[in-house]
């Protein structure tokens, strides 16, 4: 429908005034001069990248990863950092829990010599550091471990047993308002790790909630619920964890999908194991009995030997990964693979 000529002139004058006052690009039509595709960073897990629908975690956004203790939250974020560093990106780790192990981080592929690390004294200090790094425009990925450890200054200066009702929630709410715009402008990915708490007296529905108030739930573009669902064994020895991640919230693609993968102790996410499984599922790798073949050539008897072959032949592994991503990311159904039930999906209130 054609717009009235006088209205067009008035709109052009208004747009000109806005750009003059606030700078070029402060207002534009949605389809012009901007990329429609969201830039992403791999999570280190092929199945999780596919479940997210965009091939990884989105740049310029806030992401929340939460789950029980020892479920793989920090491991997953370290894998994201390793993937970002391989692309030449600068990363920072805000270690509010004071528990980052540099030896373990190096084993997961993190370049610790070029990883910025801060162990702040208070929650306000941690969030100010995040804001300063985002505003610099020089840092691509920031990880905060964890929201539960972001202690307000008033609580640290007070005594144990003092009541500080809603302080952490108020601090997080103010930080979200300030950070969201700066992150978008600098195209910085900010990942918050969070812990789970139980609400008392919940008879029906999910009693679980996350710390730090409700603001983070609203501002996060992606929320991931990570759980340990079993053990990976070699004989009688436990060598890793079977892990399930649910995409509880997703603003860049269809939500409520899930991914399952292995986290091996001292190695991280079993990427090549996922590659074999997805390759077989998509008929890129042929499986006959115990033998695995690729392009007509046998690559190993048993999954372990197939994984070893892929590790020794990175070019073939890269080729299979590219084909899997093209098949599964470009042809995603509108219907999610997995829908969490109402109890899991509901946004619950925060206990202070």
Swiss-Prot record:
GO terms for cellular component: cytosol. It is found in: Cytoplasm. Keywords: ATP-binding, Cytoplasm, DNA damage, DNA recombination, DNA repair, DNA-binding, Nucleotide-binding, SOS response. ATP binds at residues 67-74. Its main location: cytoplasm. It comes from the Bacteria. One of its GO terms (molecular function) is single-stranded DNA binding. The keyword Lipid biosynthesis does not apply. Pfam families: RecA (PF00154), RecA_C (PF21096). GO terms for biological process: DNA recombination; DNA repair; SOS response. Can catalyze the hydrolysis of ATP in the presence of single-stranded DNA, the ATP-dependent uptake of single-stranded DNA by duplex DNA, and the ATP-dependent hybridization of homologous single-stranded DNAs. It interacts with LexA causing its activation and leading to its autocatalytic cleavage. Belongs to the RecA family. This is Protein RecA.
